[in-house]
From Swiss-Prot:
<dbReference type="GO" id="GO:0006412">
    <property type="term" value="P:translation"/>
</dbReference>
<keyword id="KW-0687">Ribonucleoprotein</keyword>
<dbReference type="Pfam" id="PF03719">
    <property type="entry name" value="Ribosomal_S5_C"/>
</dbReference>
<keyword id="KW-0694">RNA-binding</keyword>
<keyword id="KW-0699">rRNA-binding</keyword>
<keyword id="KW-0689">Ribosomal protein</keyword>
<dbReference type="Pfam" id="PF00333">
    <property type="entry name" value="Ribosomal_S5"/>
</dbReference>
<comment type="function">
    <text>With S4 and S12 plays an important role in translational accuracy.</text>
</comment>
<dbReference type="InterPro" id="IPR018192">
    <property type="entry name" value="Ribosomal_uS5_N_CS"/>
</dbReference>
<comment type="function">
    <text>Located at the back of the 30S subunit body where it stabilizes the conformation of the head with respect to the body.</text>
</comment>
<dbReference type="InterPro" id="IPR000851">
    <property type="entry name" value="Ribosomal_uS5"/>
</dbReference>
<dbReference type="InterPro" id="IPR005324">
    <property type="entry name" value="Ribosomal_uS5_C"/>
</dbReference>
<dbReference type="InterPro" id="IPR005712">
    <property type="entry name" value="Ribosomal_uS5_bac-type"/>
</dbReference>
<comment type="similarity">
    <text>Belongs to the universal ribosomal protein uS5 family.</text>
</comment>
<dbReference type="InterPro" id="IPR020568">
    <property type="entry name" value="Ribosomal_Su5_D2-typ_SF"/>
</dbReference>
<dbReference type="InterPro" id="IPR014721">
    <property type="entry name" value="Ribsml_uS5_D2-typ_fold_subgr"/>
</dbReference>
<dbReference type="InterPro" id="IPR013810">
    <property type="entry name" value="Ribosomal_uS5_N"/>
</dbReference>
């Protein structure tokens, strides 16, 4: 029962190719302490956001005794937890959404072309790795980076593509788009 073994180099190359499609941003790094019998044992905790800049994004948390190891663990955790977010024209949200985690609350609004990413701190990292170019975001409550990232992901998970809304309402997607563009033109006048 001889099994065919693939060369290890090929596995490493495919892993590097897979990793190269992602962009990662370090959001926060904290020094943490574990109290043990002999005193305190120090380590580091890292929060990383990973995305492919095409609508997939994830975040991860990692802890280790050394900073690079904590970042590596957080990056691996983020790649395991990717979500897909439908983007309008590949640059902004389809509709405004609210998100919440703990005491952190965020409001994400779609924006016109050329607006840019108007968001603070941890939210900006999420939008940049997601591939979003135009968005306005406001955070209230907790400014803890962990809560802000989780609240942003909560909001992004509530993002619904207009095709899904049209299917739920039992109307054609083109009809929904026509209504949307008609209401958009009326509000600009």
């Amino acid at each position: 029962m001889a099994q065919e073994r693939r060369p290890q180099r090929d596995d490493r190359q495919s892993r590097e190719e897979r990793d190269s499609e992602f962009v990662d941003k370090l959001v926060a790094i904290n020094r943490v302490a574990k109290v043990v019998k002999g005193g305190r044992r120090f380590g580091f905790a890292a929060l990383v956001v990973v995305g492919d800049q095409k609508g997939r994004v994830g975040f991860g948390h990692g802890k280790a005794r050394e900073v690079p190891e904590a970042i590596r663990k957080a990056t691996e955790a983020a790649k395991r937890e990717l979500i897909f977010v439908p983007l309008r024209d590949g640059r902004t949200l389809h509709h405004d959404v609210h998100g919440r985690h703990g005491a952190g609350k965020v409001l994400l609004r779609s924006a016109k072309v050329g607006t840019g990413i108007i968001a603070g701190g941890p939210m900006r990292a999420v939008f940049e790795t997601l591939g979003m170019h135009d968005v306005v975001a406001k955070s209230t409550g907790s400014s803890n980076p962990y809560n802000m990232v989780r609240a942003t992901f909560d909001a992004l998970k509530h993002q619904v593509h207009p095709k899904d809304i049209a299917a739920q309402r039992g109307i054609k997607y083109a009809t929904l788009q026509a209504r949307r563009s008609a209401s958009g033109n009326a509000s600009e006048e």
